[in-house]
């Protein structure tokens, strides 16, 4: 089999049709899955000896949240080292990273696997993986044809990464230096709320403004602070953390500003405070609403004038510190109640950010669950950790009052429980492994029983026609998008439409 000019042109067109990178990537692998007739495809970005999924088709949604470290995935490591097309034999002893992650085929292992490393010049930037359930599924395609596919994918990925780099540099102050060497914190989530938050982080990171991060307990406020620091010109300098809620009143001032020898009982030597440690860097004050009014006044002075005094010292020290503060309280109400200074609130909230609770993030819960499953797999030395359909359904309908932190603990506990009831190093998480209180799954909708006026085959075909028509209307008559919505293979959908008389 060989690719026609029309097929290659179609792939190139799909890469140009999307508005954003994510849309282009999704179109690419959906088209490839249709052209190559594979069961699953994935586009991965390479970063710091791990592959990060950018777009998937035919794989469980939680794959988008997983991070595939080369040390734990020998097939992906082989792809990264190869420099050319890699075909894994059906009897390969190397475990496939997607075993158990193809919906409806959780109990079966992938039999055919092809890996295409993607390069920008001599640098590895990603990989394209193609998987199938039949051992000889990709034998009809030559290496030369697959290299052509890899070149198209590499060009799209390289351009996207270059655009991201240029956009980041354009947001930097004119005298700032690039900070590509600093490892970026990964914030997992594709929901509208998280997408907006990431944009706001990118905007404010390039400035030197103070930021107030608000959100419920467990939403990931510290992760937001890390992301701001790592994307800022201060990234090469320290990010210093202080939990204000854990500060005893007797040592709080010393922790913030330091002390000199003999300043109080037990001060046996000079000691720098958090502000000095964070000089030229960033200070993250977690649970800022717990500070006493007296300390709030001293903190306000530092923000106003940029100098500090160690406890017991009359001299002032100049510091250059960016302050990021976080709270799970409504500080506006705290100001009205007289428990928080209004002037400090306005100083801190120059650029406020709000982290959405997990219950408002839709399918992000599945992506995060995949991320934590992969963490557990590596930590416990397991070959795979897979979420069953029942477990995914449960996670999507639980409200998670403890947010992301509660999800992380729930996944870890479920892995331990599942491992205890199974032999071997493969873990499948079922709904019963999660101990969520008061979880009510939505009941199936009751429907009126229609009067039967046609035989079963006619009724089935009528239902199929109407379902396909509605899906096409919702997806602007894009057959690939329609197939994704109906969770079926696009080639099978075309064949069904022809049989139903919907296509010539």
Curated annotation (Swiss-Prot):
SUPFAM superfamilies: GAF domain-like, Homeodomain-like, P-loop containing nucleoside triphosphate hydrolases. GO terms for biological process: phosphorelay signal transduction system. Keywords: ATP-binding, DNA-binding, Nucleotide-binding, Phosphoprotein, Transcription, Transcription regulation. Pfam families: GAF (PF01590), Sigma54_activat (PF00158). SMART domains: AAA, GAF. It comes from the Bacteria. Residues 479-498 bind DNA. The keyword Mitochondrion does not apply. GO terms for molecular function: ATP binding; ATP hydrolysis activity; DNA binding; DNA-binding transcription factor activity. PROSITE patterns: SIGMA54_INTERACT_1, SIGMA54_INTERACT_2, SIGMA54_INTERACT_3, SIGMA54_INTERACT_4. The modification 4-aspartylphosphate is found at residue 57. ATP binds at residues 215-222, 278-287. Pathway: Nitrogen metabolism; nitric oxide reduction. Residues 187-416 form the Sigma-54 factor interaction domain. InterPro entries: AAA+_ATPase, GAF, GAF-like_dom_sf, Homeodomain-like_sf, NorR, P-loop_NTPase, Sigma_54_int, Sigma_54_int_dom_ATP-bd_1. NCBIfam families: PRK05022.1. Required for the expression of anaerobic nitric oxide (NO) reductase, acts as a transcriptional activator for at least the norVW operon. Activation also requires sigma-54. This is Anaerobic nitric oxide reductase transcription regulator NorR. It comes from Escherichia coli (strain 55989 / EAEC). The lineage of its organism: Bacteria, Pseudomonadati, Pseudomonadota, Gammaproteobacteria, Enterobacterales.
